[in-house]
């Protein structure tokens, strides 16, 4: 079974890679929905734009969605935002994902002026999506201003992620979510002897319990990127008469452009652009765009380099770095869209980087440039002149062309012309006139009604050859060669002379042919599909062109003379067609409405090949053979068309067709050899395509073989000969058992459900008994075995609902429709199986294995539209065939579902042949030829030139070993010795962690080994490798008709969550072990300093490993760790995936009827719970069973006399044969891929769903106590806008964390009194203002299976009027109970006990079999003992599930929880688990600001003193109210030396735990007029102090000095402040209060109010009224003058009002 499991896992892995490859490369124009969440955590060191500091806020742009903004923080350079923003409804195709980005701008808010930009940074969406878990977690971004070069303007800490519809948000446990302020000292555990003086001082400071926060350590390596642009050639003139071109290059947030070269189509730029690049890179794209400058209008966009960005091209910085950092001078060709063909608004989209990425349809010239990436710590942004350069070597090529025929469903006019453009040079074909068939009117009405209108243009033999040969010098390297662009023009020439000019031409369609295409190598005509110039989808087809295009070097062309190709020669061919069956036909139709008829058209003949047979999966088993006259060279022949129609009564609906190239069907046989067996047909899947969509697929094969016979119109040999593909001896007889539990989670309920079980059969004569054949004659036309069952319980309810009512003497039976319940969860609990007499035919050859079709529908004829269906491949369950063959056939079938895009490929047969396993009858010559074809194809398409590969090898050898890949992702499990080097290189393409974004691609050359000779590999390894490699190559080429760099298969940058979790666990264990050793060394006071140094160094090495761990490990003096203890295992991957391995049943997905390109319908969340087993039976037993049935039917009176012994004998013989079969399967390799043994089951007493006893378990009521433990939610989607008034008036938008108020609803059942609880609404506990709510609550519900099988938990958002659903998750309780091996074994034991007790009761009074009864009793006691011995301390793991919204496609968040679904008897034994939310602990901070020292004077020229005051703020997360607390000291006036005395106490409330326990101290210069000027600030973290608080009641910090810093004056001394601090708990603070400042109660210590700097003279010091500048006499004179002035004023008052004193 290990071999089987490994084979199945291998094939699933391969198919998963294939699906990803198709999704990435085949549907570039298909938009997918994404959701982005950005969390702005904090900013540090922001440059101050005003005197009092900046008032920063962050503005976030994501693609073309409206920007969002954070709240504004006042007067600070280090601020905490801690806000999350959700960007929904982001629809992007693959190219838009590569082009668009997240832009973060930090802006200074001004009330009455323009808001200046502080700095910005960008993150590429594609870079983010390729990172680990699609996220950057707590990443520091350096802010850059466009006008300030690369000088940092501050630092921004962010977390962000992007998810698609199939992705889940990243999850981090509570310990990882802790903020870590201690990242400023990386040498904390390094011995002092190894540090310099400055490092030792910093280390001493950082060992204190209260430390300042420094700027983030810049761990990014700086590189210099040189983009050297030499020149351009053949640039187009888009408007006017000149081309004034320039080139703009963008790297990250920096943009540079060359000078504008006017009036030249061959501009010479000679410019070198210098970009500083930092690793890891957060935006890895290098974008180069070529423009045509216009003076009085907007510039014309010409083209971009690269045209289609890819993660593996040269213009990805990570890829460039992995290839050695150097790309030599190369030509890059430009492909654009002519102005008349451009869609409206295309230029605006290009400028805004929002282009839809329209494929270039016209050649626009080429650019010579090079890239160089090297380490340089002094790189500066700018332009330099370019020195010498070396152009790539060139070679002269010649292109020849012949045109023969054009077929199009579009009217291209009376005349057409074909133009071939290669590297800017053009040749044109002769004009061709539209053809009018003379025999068109002679076609019968039946055929003409089915024939679609086709416009045909045929060149005469004398006009087909284009006499002009195009000669051109192009680079020798094939990756630098331009595409051959073939354009179709409709021409309106002069009617007399047939002359025309450019104005008479209108381009209709085009095709781009890669120069590496094998179609250009040989001189033979081929059919090409042309695309319309204005296409809607990239797969749209305009017309088919038969032409011959040759591209050869001049030397080869001279050696090979050009011969005219004539088409008039005819040849007789023997056509053989093999149509086995259809699969998943008409996804939008029901099976009853599907009756397919097929019509073959080859040459001029139209033949009906398949008559109508009902069913979506049908077996035709038809082969036909006839003679046909075709072109001698099949390249000229038109495609073989098979049209399909759906018969609806007398009407026939066209549903699509398949097209096969005639030349691909040719079979060549050496007629000289005698007795050669006919070649075996090569079967493959063909999709029935209609308007680009698949309407199903068929399994067929077609052959064309030359014949020496002559065509005689009256000869019978010309008539088709029909036969069967497989005869009776090619089948095996099987019995299919299908234990059906039921259907779960239907989107729309069904009132009268019935279940249909259907398997297609080649015929039914042997299947149905005589009686059934008479009753159901219609089955002989359907050709499938079918069983229909109904729901018995619903029938009984319906009968009870019938009411009889008498009206006018007549009795009518009326069903109360309103009492019928629409069921969404239906239990059938029955075993569907065919009788042994009705054994089904299954082909021995597994490639013809039929599909089991299941359908659930409503019996009522009026509502038959409510239907769901599913298809199951029987290969997994077939008991014959080895594992390798089955895996190959599974891959063959799965690829058949996905190969619709291969129909667009020019060489699909070469690809499909690799999917088919070589038959045993194939000779070695055919095998060797296939291997040689594969090698040639690989040589032509997958490698560069010899010289280029040698350069890459040399560069890779010199690259740093530290940047090699750490792990490989196996694309295919092949033998290492036989594995091609190119595939080994592909396996090395994997992602590193998000902290090391320098992703490496170990691309080693295989040209050296190929130069020494090809190595002959085994057949098995070659075919497996060829399938994988050619599939990637062909899928890439089929959808990419253009490229600017070599082919590199797209590889997703992902790392499995299991690997990541194991890596973290291993690191944590190592760190803990080493830390414990250090602690023991300190505790025992050992003097082995060397050992201690070594251990400390190892700890630092582990912490500074490539992957930066974000879990917070608080290191105290003892080195211990402090983390949240979950008390159980944490499972990050979906637990359901693990549980399904132990389920005793399978779950088959249900689909609704509807169109879907790669599936059988519209997928739903509904499933069928059932299992499947295929039993092979001997023909003798079948005949014996049939004979007994016939005898019984002949004598109906003796039907009941058919003794039980007779039936038991038949069954016993059957069981014996099945046992023999099963035994042989165990001994040999022939056994099903599916395992029927559940993991962890007791093999003596297994849970066997194929026994009715266990199947009835799902019908009985099974009581559960379900305990739901909700811990917390992370990254939930914001629900509404909440924004500050300033930003709202400015027109901004924001959806932030303050807009979500989550609460919980558990269960959706109805409560039955107080004892049975099935629904809990916890709206009393609402989490306020958060996207990461913490619940830490347990909810206990009652559940009864199967009624309450689905548990629903909803996260609601509390609204002002109506509560809205944020998201929900559902849990299948049946899966949880039966997926846990302990619970499943317990249920199995109890079931066996009940069965044995029934047997004991049955044999209670039968004393003859007392031994059997005693044996049952012994087993009962044994099982009871086993139940008691089971583990009763079950600790189910913590898991993460996605929150889904019924109306939204993307995930709405993640919930952290664990579940205990225990039976009642188990719930009584196991008590509920205890979960406690970290309770807030309230403290009080008593901070005393004593003095300041050396505070600088803000403007020494104008002022000689400074008026000092301090502002202290406590972060909002440290306050229980969630508000920032800001307090100020009084002002120390007139300080000349920067010293100030305050003796000022501040009291702050503190609550822990908190995210940011920080105090920000800012010193300012007081100003009576205007704003105060900020002189410096420092932020101190209390995180270490909080740990001390948990150990004791009081934390006290003695008087300590902290230095001030200012981001505008880096490295300058801004003074310091002397403070002391005491933190006590709230109870102690309330019992012993203190006052603010020097207020009462003034104690502990008593603070004296300072007098220095508080007088009026101090206030006026330094101004024009400064008394200190006067002498003593001047001051005395002033006093006298003041006295005289007061006396005069008093006398004047008495003079004006003399009675004032009397009054």
UniProtKB/Swiss-Prot annotation:
Regions of compositional bias (Polar residues) in chain numbering: 979-991
Alphabetized UniProt keyword annotations: Exocytosis, Membrane, Repeat, Transmembrane, Transmembrane helix
Positions with biased composition (Basic and acidic residues): 993-1009, 1641-1651
Family as reported in the entry's similarity comment: Belongs to the ferlin family.
Annotated protein name in UniProt: Ferlin 2
Functional description taken from the UniProt entry: Regulates mucocyst exocytosis.
Transmembrane segments: 1681-1701
Domain of life of the organism encoding this protein: Eukaryota
UniProt feature, compositional bias: Acidic residues: 916-928
Gene Ontology BP terms: exocytosis; plasma membrane organization
Species of origin: Tetrahymena thermophila (strain SB210)
Bias type Low complexity, positions: 1198-1209
One Gene Ontology cellular component annotation held by this UniProt entry: membrane
Residues in C2 domain copies: 18-141, 207-332, 1466-1595
Gene3D superfamilies: C2 domain
InterPro entries per record: C2_dom (IPR000008), C2_domain_sf (IPR035892), FerIin_dom (IPR012968), Ferlin (IPR037721)
Chain segments carrying region Disordered: 913-937, 970-1025, 1194-1228, 1628-1651
Phenotype of gene-disrupted mutants: Gene knockout results in defects in mucocyst release when stimulated with the secretagogue dibucaine. No significant effects on the biogenesis of mucocyst and their docking at the plasma membrane.
Lineage: Eukaryota, Sar, Alveolata, Ciliophora, Intramacronucleata
Subcellular location: Membrane
Bilayer topology annotation: Single-pass membrane protein
């Amino acid at each position: 079974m290990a071999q089987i499991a490994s084979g199945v896992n291998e094939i699933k892995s391969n198919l998963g890679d294939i699906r990803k490859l198709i999704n990435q490369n085949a549907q570039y124009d298909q938009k997918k929905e994404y959701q982005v969440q950005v969390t702005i955590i904090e900013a540090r060191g922001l440059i101050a734009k005003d005197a009092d500091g900046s008032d920063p806020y962050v503005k976030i742009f994501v693609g073309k969605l409206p920007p969002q903004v954070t709240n504004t923080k006042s007067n600070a350079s280090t601020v905490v935002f801690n806000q999350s923003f959700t960007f929904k409804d982001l629809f992007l195709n693959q190219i838009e994902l590569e082009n668009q980005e997240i832009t973060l701008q930090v802006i200074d808010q001004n009330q009455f002026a323009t808001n200046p930009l502080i700095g910005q940074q960008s993150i590429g969406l594609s870079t983010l999506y390729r990172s680990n878990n699609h996220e950057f977690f707590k990443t520091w971004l350096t802010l850059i201003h466009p006008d300030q070069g690369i000088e940092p303007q501050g630092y921004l800490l962010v977390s962000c992620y992007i998810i698609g519809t199939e992705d889940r948000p990243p999850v981090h446990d509570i310990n990882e979510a802790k903020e870590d302020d201690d990242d400023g000292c990386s040498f904390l555990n390094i011995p002092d002897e190894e540090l310099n003086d400055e490092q030792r001082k910093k280390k001493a400071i950082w060992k204190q319990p209260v430390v300042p926060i420094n700027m983030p350590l810049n761990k990014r390596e700086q590189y210099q990127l040189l983009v050297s642009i030499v020149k351009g050639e053949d640039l187009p003139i888009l408007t006017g008469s000149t081309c004034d071109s320039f080139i703009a290059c963008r790297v990250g947030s920096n943009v540079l452009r060359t000078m504008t070269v006017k009036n030249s189509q061959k501009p010479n730029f000679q410019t070198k652009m210098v970009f500083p690049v930092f690793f890891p890179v957060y935006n890895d794209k290098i974008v180069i765009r070529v423009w045509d400058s216009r003076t009085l209008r907007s510039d014309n966009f010409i083209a971009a380099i690269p045209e289609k960005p890819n993660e593996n091209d040269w213009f990805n910085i990570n890829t460039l770095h992995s290839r050695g950092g150097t790309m030599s001078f190369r030509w890059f060709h430009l492909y654009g869209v002519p102005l008349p063909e451009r869609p409206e608004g295309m230029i605006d989209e290009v400028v805004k980087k929002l282009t839809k990425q329209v494929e270039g349809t016209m050649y626009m010239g080429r650019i010579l440039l090079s890239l160089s990436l090297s380490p340089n710590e002094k790189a500066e942004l700018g332009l330099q002149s370019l020195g010498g350069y070396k152009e790539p070597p060139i070679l002269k090529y010649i292109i020849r062309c012949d045109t023969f025929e054009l077929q199009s469903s579009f009217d291209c006019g009376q005349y057409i012309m074909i133009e071939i453009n290669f590297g800017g040079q053009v040749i044109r074909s002769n004009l061709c006139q539209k053809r009018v068939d003379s025999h068109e009117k002679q076609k019968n009405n039946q055929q003409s009604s089915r024939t679609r209108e086709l416009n045909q243009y045929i060149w005469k033999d004398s006009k087909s050859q284009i006499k002009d040969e195009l000669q051109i010098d192009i680079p020798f390297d094939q990756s630098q060669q331009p595409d051959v662009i073939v354009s179709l023009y409709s021409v309106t020439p002069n009617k007399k002379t047939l002359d025309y000019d450019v104005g008479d031409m209108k381009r209709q369609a085009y095709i781009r042919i890669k120069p590496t295409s094998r179609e250009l190598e040989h001189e033979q005509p081929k059919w090409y599909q042309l695309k319309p110039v204005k296409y809607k989808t990239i797969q749209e087809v305009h017309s088919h062109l038969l032409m011959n295009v040759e591209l050869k070097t001049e030397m080869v062309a001279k050696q090979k003379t050009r011969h005219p190709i004539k088409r008039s020669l005819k040849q007789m061919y023997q056509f053989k067609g093999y149509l086995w069956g259809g699969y998943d036909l008409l996804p939008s139709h029901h099976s009853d409405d599907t009756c397919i008829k097929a019509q073959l058209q080859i040459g001029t003949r139209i033949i009906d090949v398949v008559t109508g047979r009902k069913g979506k999966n049908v077996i035709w088993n038809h082969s036909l053979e006839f003679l046909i006259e075709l072109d001698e060279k099949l390249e000229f022949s038109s495609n073989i068309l098979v049209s399909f129609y759906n018969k609806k009564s007398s009407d026939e609906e066209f549903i699509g067709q398949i097209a096969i190239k005639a030349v691909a069907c040719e079979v060549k046989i050496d007629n000289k050899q005698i007795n050669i067996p006919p070649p075996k047909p090569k079967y493959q899947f063909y999709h029935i395509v209609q308007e680009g969509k698949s309407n199903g697929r068929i399994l067929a094969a077609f052959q064309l073989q030359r014949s020496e016979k002559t065509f005689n119109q009256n000869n019978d040999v010309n008539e088709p000969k029909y036969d069967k593909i497989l005869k009776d001896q090619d089948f095996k007889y099987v019995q299919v058992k299908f234990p059906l539990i039921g259907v779960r989670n239907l989107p729309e309920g069904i009132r009268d459900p019935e279940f249909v079980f259907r398997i297609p059969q080649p015929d039914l004569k042997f299947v149905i008994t005589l009686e059934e054949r008479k009753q159901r004659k219609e089955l002989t036309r359907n050709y499938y075995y079918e069983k229909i069952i109904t729901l018995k319980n619903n029938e009984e309810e319906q009968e009870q609902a019938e009411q009889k009512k008498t009206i006018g003497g007549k009795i009518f039976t009326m069903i109360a429709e309103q009492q019928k319940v629409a069921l969404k969860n239906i239990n059938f609990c029955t075993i569907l199986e065919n009788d042994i007499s009705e054994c089904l035919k299954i082909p021995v050859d597994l490639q013809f294995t039929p599909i089991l079709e299941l359908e659930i529908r409503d019996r009522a004829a009026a509502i038959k539209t409510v239907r769901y269906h599913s298809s199951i491949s029987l290969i997994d369950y077939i008991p014959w065939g080895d594992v390798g063959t089955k895996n190959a056939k599974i891959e063959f079938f799965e690829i058949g579902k996905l190969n619709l895009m291969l129909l667009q490929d020019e060489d699909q047969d070469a690809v499909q042949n690799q999917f088919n396993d070589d038959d045993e009858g194939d000779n070695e010559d055919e095998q060797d030829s296939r291997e040689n074809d594969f090698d040639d194809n690989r040589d032509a398409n997958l490698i560069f030139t010899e010289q280029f590969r040698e350069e890459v090898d040399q560069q890779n050898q010199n690259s740093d070993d530290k940047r090699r890949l750490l792990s490989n992702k196996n694309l295919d499990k092949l033998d290492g010795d036989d594995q091609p080097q190119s595939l080994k290189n592909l396996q090395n393409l994997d992602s590193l962690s998000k902290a090391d974004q320098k992703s490496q691609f170990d691309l080693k050359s295989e040209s050296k080994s190929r130069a020494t000779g090809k190595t002959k590999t085994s057949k098995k390894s070659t075919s497996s490798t060829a399938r994988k490699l050619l599939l990637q190559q062909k899928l890439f080429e089929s959808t990419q008709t253009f490229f600017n760099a070599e082919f590199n298969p797209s590889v997703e940058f992902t790392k499995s969550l299991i690997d990541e979790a194991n890596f973290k666990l291993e690191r944590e264990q190592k760190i803990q072990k080493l830390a414990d050793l250090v602690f023991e060394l300190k505790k025992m006071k050992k003097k082995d300093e060397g050992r201690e140094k070594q251990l400390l160094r190892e700890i630092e090495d582990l912490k500074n490993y490539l992957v930066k761990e974000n879990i917070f490990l608080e290191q105290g003096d003892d080195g211990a760790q402090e983390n949240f203890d979950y008390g159980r295992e944490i499972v990050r991957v979906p637990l359901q995936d693990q549980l399904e391995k132990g389920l005793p049943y399978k779950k088959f997905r249900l689909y609704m009827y509807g169109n879907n390109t790669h599936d059988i319908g519209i997928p739903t969340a509904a499933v069928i719970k059932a299992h499947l087993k295929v039993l092979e039976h001997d023909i003798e037993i079948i005949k014996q069973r049939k004979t007994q049935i016939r005898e019984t039917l002949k004598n109906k009176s003796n039907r009941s006399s058919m003794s039980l012994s007779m039936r038991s004998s038949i069954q016993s013989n059957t069981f014996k044969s099945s046992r023999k079969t099963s035994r042989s399967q165990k001994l040999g390799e022939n056994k099903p891929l599916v395992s029927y043994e559940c993991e962890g089951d007791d093999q003596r007493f297994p849970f066997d769903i194929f026994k009715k006893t266990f199947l009835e378990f799902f019908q009985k009521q099974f009581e559960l106590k379900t305990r739901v433990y909700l811990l917390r939610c992370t990254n939930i989607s914001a629900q509404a806008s909440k924004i500050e008034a300033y930003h709202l008036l400015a027109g901004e938008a924001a959806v932030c964390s303050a807009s979500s108020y989550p609460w919980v609803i558990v269960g959706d059942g109805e409560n039955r009194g107080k004892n049975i609880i099935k629904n809990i609404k916890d709206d009393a506990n609402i989490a306020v203002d958060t996207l990461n709510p913490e619940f830490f609550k347990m909810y206990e519900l009652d559940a009864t299976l199967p009624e309450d099988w689905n548990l629903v938990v909803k996260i609601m958002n509390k609204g002002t009027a109506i509560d809205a659903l944020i998201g929900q998750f559902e849990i299948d309780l049946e899966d949880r109970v039966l997926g846990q091996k302990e619970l499943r074994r317990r249920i199995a034991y109890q079931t066996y006990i009940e069965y044995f007790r029934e047997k004991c009761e049955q044999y209670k009074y039968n004393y003859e079999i007392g031994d059997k009864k005693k044996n049952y009793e012994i087993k009962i006691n044994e099982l009871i003992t086993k139940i008691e011995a089971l583990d009763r301390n079950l600790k189910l793991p913590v898991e993460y599930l996605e929150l889904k919204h019924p109306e939204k496609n993307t995930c709405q968040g993640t919930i952290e929880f664990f579940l205990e679904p225990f039976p009642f008897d188990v719930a009584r034994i196991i008590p509920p688990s205890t979960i406690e939310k970290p309770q807030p602990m309230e403290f009080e901070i008593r901070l005393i600001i004593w003095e300041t020292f050396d505070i600088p004077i803000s403007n020494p020229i104008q002022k000689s003193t400074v008026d000092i005051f301090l502002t202290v703020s406590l972060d909002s997360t440290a306050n229980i109210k969630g508000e920032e607390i800001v307090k100020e000291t009084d002002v120390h006036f007139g300080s000349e030396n920067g010293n100030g005395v305050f003796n000022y106490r501040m009291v702050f409330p503190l609550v822990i735990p908190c995210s940011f326990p920080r105090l920000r101290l800012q010193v300012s210069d007081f100003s009576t007029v205007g704003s105060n000027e900020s002189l410096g600030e420092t932020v101190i973290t209390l995180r270490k102090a909080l740990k001390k608080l948990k150990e004791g009641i009081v934390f006290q910090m003695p008087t300590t000095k902290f230095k001030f810093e200012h981001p505008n004056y880096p490295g300058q001394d801004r003074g310091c402040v002397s403070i002391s601090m005491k933190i006590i708990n709230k109870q102690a603070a309330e019992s012993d209060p203190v006052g603010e400042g020097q207020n009462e109660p003034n104690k502990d210590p008593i603070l004296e109010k300072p007098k220095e700097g508080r007088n009026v003279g101090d206030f006026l010091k330094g101004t024009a009224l400064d008394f200190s500048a006067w002498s003593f006499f001047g001051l005395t004179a002033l006093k006298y003058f003041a006295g005289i002035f007061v006396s005069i004023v008093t006398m004047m008052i008495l003079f004006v009002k003399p009675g004032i004193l009397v009054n």
